[in-house]
Amino acid sequence: RAEGIGVICRELEKENPALPVILTGDFNAKAGASAPYTRALEAGFRDAWVEAPEKKGPPVTWSAFAAPKEGEDSRIDWVLFRGNVSAKSCETVLYNEDGRYPTDHFPVLAGLTLAP
């Protein structure tokens, strides 16, 4: 996974490195101290969940089709950005119908602003 994010970062550097980039997805690694997360930060990416002043929902994105447990912290789905982008809000969407979740991941919704 760390090599995968490394490939993405190297390919992005071939383009105009001054352009803003938004990178999202299921990285199958916890945000924080995992190698892919560290590699992304070293490449200049910032994490919308960390940067956003307004947060909603728990810091959990993998659900195993169940509600998150109190105090759980397992963000493996990230919204990363770099360049002239800022995070205004970030939310883990806990949508379910009668306790049935449509997927084993909670969607992440980020409010981002692109500066001129």
What do the PLM-derived regions correspond to, one by one?
Residues 1-116:
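Active-site regions of metal-assisted phosphoester/phosphodiester hydrolases
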